[in-house]
């Protein structure tokens, strides 16, 4: 974990990327904000009721005098953001509805990012994934050519570093969706200094089993390879592989001789949300890997979701990752 963060901090040095932390009334978030403020790579913007936040800071003995603190209910920016929200939603929200929605810290924070007043957002310490992601999908939306956002986890232990996806967002995926996630995951790997070798996973290796589920992954491999070639993406994408064939050279030699990947994959695209979510938790709980994420990909600007059981360190680390995404 330290190696990844050190690489990102080097990239971010002197950049002072503005990251919105909507949950300023949470002590973990406020503590992390003071730690980030002390760096030259992230400048936090904290949202919340001034009286509550200042009282919390006093209780925790935190100096927040240099942190930008915004109360969505009383901010001078609100009128401007309300108008921008109404225009962005194109008839799906009245001004009155927008006024009410922007009292919500996640909507207000997301609008700060959309309006260019911040570079990214980290939330979820006190909100559900839906509460964090919904405003992003409505306001920031996905990049051109990307139809969905997806959630990857960095799985880290010692000097081992892998990406697992999608483990957080999409319950049902067709071949096109899997291909898109494979390409976006490869781009994420590149942006974090990895040489992407993407394995698309199944219970079959190179046709060893036959079913509609296997066919879906096989089609996804072809689509992902085609998309990567069109975009001149420096990545290897191959499949379908069982997990052992994707990560153990000796198994790959027997099960998939001649495959582009020979047990050296570092990015794993799971065939379903079920498989991805279960897979990362097994690696985390039984394998002893640190699971950093979910890191959302495919959005026009970075928005990331914390676990409600997160630590101060988690808030800090995900803010660093979000800032690095903003520089892409």
Swiss-Prot record:
User: EC number(s) on record?
Assistant: 2.3.1.8
Compartments (UniProt record):
Cytoplasm
GO molecular function ontology, one term from the record: phosphate acetyltransferase activity
Which chemical reaction does it catalyze? acetyl-CoA + phosphate = acetyl phosphate + CoA
Q: Tell me one GO biological process term.
A: acetyl-CoA biosynthetic process
Organism superkingdom: Bacteria
Pathway where it operates = Metabolic intermediate biosynthesis; acetyl-CoA biosynthesis; acetyl-CoA from acetate: step 2/2
Disulfide cross-links: none
Q: Which PANTHER family match?
A: PHOSPHATE ACETYLTRANSFERASE
| Protein name per UniProt | Phosphate acetyltransferase
Q: Which gene encodes it?
A: pta
């Amino acid at each position: 974990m330290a190696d990844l963060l050190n690489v990102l901090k080097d990239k971010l040095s002197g950049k002072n990327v503005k990251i919105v932390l909507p949950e300023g009334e949470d002590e973990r978030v406020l503590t992390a904000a003071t730690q980030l403020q002390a760096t030259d790579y992230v400048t936090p913007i904290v949202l919340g009721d001034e009286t509550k936040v200042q009282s919390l800071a006093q209780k925790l003995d935190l100096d927040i005098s240099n942190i930008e603190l915004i109360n969505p209910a009383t901010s001078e920016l609100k009128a401007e953001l309300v108008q921008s929200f109404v225009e962005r939603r194109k008839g799906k929200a009245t001004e009155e509805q927008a006024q009410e929605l922007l009292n919500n810290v996640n909507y207000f924070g997301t609008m700060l990012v959309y309006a260019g007043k911040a570079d990214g957002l980290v939330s979820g310490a006190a909100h559900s994934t839906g509460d964090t992601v919904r405003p992003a999908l409505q306001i920031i939306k996905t990049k051109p050519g990307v139809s969905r956002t997806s959630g990857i986890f960095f799985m880290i232990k010692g000097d081992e570093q892998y990406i697992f996806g999608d483990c957080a967002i999409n319950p049902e995926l067709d071949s096109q969706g899997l291909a898109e996630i494979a390409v976006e995951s490869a781009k994420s790997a590149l942006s974090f200094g990895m040489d992407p070798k993407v394995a698309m996973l199944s219970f079959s290796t190179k046709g060893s089993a036959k079913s509609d589920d296997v066919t879906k992954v096989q089609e996804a491999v072809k689509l992902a390879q085609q998309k990567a070639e069109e975009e001149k993406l420096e990545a290897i994408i191959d499949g379908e592989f069982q997990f052992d064939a994707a990560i153990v050279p000796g198994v790959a030699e027997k099960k998939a001789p001649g495959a582009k990947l020979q047990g050296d994959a570092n990015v794993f695209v799971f065939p379903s949300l079920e498989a991805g979510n279960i897979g990362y938790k097994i690696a985390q709980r039984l394998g002893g890997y640190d699971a950093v994420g979910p890191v959302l990909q495919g959005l026009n600007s970075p928005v990331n979701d914390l676990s409600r059981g997160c630590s101060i360190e988690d808030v800090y680390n995900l803010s660093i990752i979000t800032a690095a995404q903003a520089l892409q």
